[in-house]
Structures are given as C-alpha cells and as structure tokens.
C-alpha cells in the first residue's frame, strides 16, 4: 500500500503553494521523515493485522484518540481509552458517561479508517465519510453538512448554505499544490473556520491533518490536551495573519510523535538515526529495576532548534517550548 501511495503522490508534479514560506524549525529532513512514515505505516499495518499489543499501533491510536477526545471535554482517562481500544466495546462498567465511550469507540474505528484510505485523495465526500465514522450513533445525521448556524467562540463561521461551495473550493485549492506541512496547517485553519458540521469539526479537522501528513510523507502530529491552549491561541494568530506560531507548534508536535514512536520501530538503524538527529538517547533497561525513562535528555533540549519566545507546551513526560509571535 505504501508504494502505491507514494507512486500516486510523486506521479504527478504539483506546483508549490506560493503562500508557503521557506522557513522551518524541523530538525529532520524530508527524506528522513519519509523513511519514518514508510516504516511507521508498514509496522502499524503489521501490528494491527497480527493483533500485536503495546507497539506503535496501540501507542499512537490511544494517544490520538485520548488527546483529541479530551480536548473536546471527554471525561475518559487514558486507561479507559486504552480499554475501549482493546475491547472495541461501547460500554465501560466504571464509566458514567456512555456518550463519551461511544464517541471514543467510534474514534478508534475512524483512526483505522484513515489508514485504510491513505490512497484516496481528499474530497468533500471523503470528509463526510470521516465524520460518519466518528459520529455514527451519536448524531441523528452523521456525515452531513450543518443545516443550522454554529460558532466557535468569537470566530464567525460559515453559514449553512455556504458550506458546500466553500468546502469544494478549499479542497480543490488544497489538492492543487504539492503537499507541505504549511499547506496542511493552512487547510486545517480554514476548515475549522468554516466549521461545516454541527459537531465534531475539531476532531475531523485534526484527523485530516494527521492523515494528510502521512500521505505527504511528513511526520504526523497529535494535538495534545496538555498543549491545547497554545494550539487554540496559535489558531487565532493564524487567522489574524501570523502563521509562524501554529506551524512551529505543529513541528514541535511532530518531534514529540517521533520521540514516542521511534524507539519502538523495528528498523533499529532508522530509529537510531531519528533519535540521533534529535539528540535523544535511546531508552535503556536495568536488570534490577526494569525500564528507565525515555531518555536522559528531555525533549526540551532536543528542540533547541525550535526558536521560542516564551510559550510552553506541557506533555505527559516532557516540556516543550515553541515560538509564540
């Protein structure tokens, strides 16, 4: 599947989006990112098919679902999210919020759907399919554009009658240009501003960004609940015309993803190359004390190349600093 995917991506040359800048704080080259994505997709498929636990597949799907649900107010813990993934059940005996469980179960299925459809180009109908996967059994009409107005704080979103044409235009413009992180981030901001569905827009938008990174051979990123304030502030800054903050945030989350996944890659040589480029030491075992920490160097030190002016992102096990303009 991966070879077919990259043949599709490289078979037709697309022009660079003139709005893209040349700036980047990403310490990993495009070639190394592409190698990572190839290895990650292949290992995810193998672990998923073989039912192998505690690998890159389980780690990434639990992090993806837990964080993107938590951001939206889910009360489920990471342990409960993992239980839903392992059992694929929509009922948890210790949960008082069955709606959260249903959406979490749907979210795990949606994650699999993203991988199963990597060879499909992004279209309005495909976006509706993602929403259907997420909101089936939760909404009366999942997978359909909104018919009533909605809002996101002070952000003015599209009117229902405007949604079809705006999404068509957005997707057409996105597919016109060669894939880049900046193009993906730009799509994400515009999609969230349109807010085409009654509910689930944030989760669908972040799912699209994750998938499109994989399709482009770029390291994907997960928006963590711990960093959501920086994420939302960066979205607002992007809408106001300052694009660098959100792009730097996405790059920091890309590094966070690699830092978590790289030590588990079956390709040890690639794993060492990735960790070496980031200045992160490989985790070590002690025969009398078990596993000892992810690294003696924090992700903060590995991200010295990401220039910052003071905003902090806290993750479960590390602290990042990203540029805020």
Each language-model region and where it sits:
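FIC/Doc superfamily catalytic core
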Residues: 1-199, 203-325
């Amino acid at each position: 599947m991966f070879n077919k995917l990259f043949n599709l991506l490289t078979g037709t040359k697309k022009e660079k989006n003139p709005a893209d800048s040349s700036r980047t704080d990403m310490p990993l080259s495009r070639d190394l990112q592409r190698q990572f994505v190839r290895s990650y997709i292949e290992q995810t498929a193998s672990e998923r098919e073989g039912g192998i636990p505690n690998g890159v597949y389980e780690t990434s799907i639990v992090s993806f679902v837990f964080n993107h649900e938590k951001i939206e107010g889910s009360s489920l813990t990471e342990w409960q999210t993992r239980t839903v993934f392992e059992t694929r059940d929509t009922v948890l005996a210790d949960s008082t919020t069955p709606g959260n469980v249903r959406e979490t179960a749907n979210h795990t299925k949606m994650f699999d759907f993203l991988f199963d459809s990597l060879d499909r180009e992004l279209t309005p109908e495909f976006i509706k399919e993602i929403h259907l996967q997420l909101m089936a059994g939760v909404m009366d009409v999942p997978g359909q554009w909104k018919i009533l107005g909605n809002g996101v704080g002070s952000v003015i979103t599209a009117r229902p009658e405007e949604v079809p044409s705006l999404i068509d235009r957005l997707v057409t413009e996105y597919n016109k240009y060669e894939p880049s992180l900046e193009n993906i981030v730009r799509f994400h901001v515009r999609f969230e501003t349109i807010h085409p569905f009654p509910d689930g827009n944030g989760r669908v938008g972040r799912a699209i960004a994750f998938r499109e990174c994989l399709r482009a051979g770029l390291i994907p990123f997960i928006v963590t609940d711990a960093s959501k304030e920086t994420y939302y502030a960066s979205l607002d800054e992007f809408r106001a015309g300052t694009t660098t903050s959100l792009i730097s945030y996405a790059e920091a989350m890309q590094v966070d993803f690699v830092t978590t996944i790289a030590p588990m890659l079956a390709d040890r040589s690639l794993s060492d190359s990735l960790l070496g480029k980031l200045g992160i030491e490989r985790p070590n075992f002690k025969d009398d004390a078990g596993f000892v920490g992810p690294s003696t160097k924090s992700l903060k030190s590995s991200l010295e190349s990401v220039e910052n002016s003071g905003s902090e992102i806290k993750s479960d096990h590390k602290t990042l600093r990203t540029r805020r303009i």
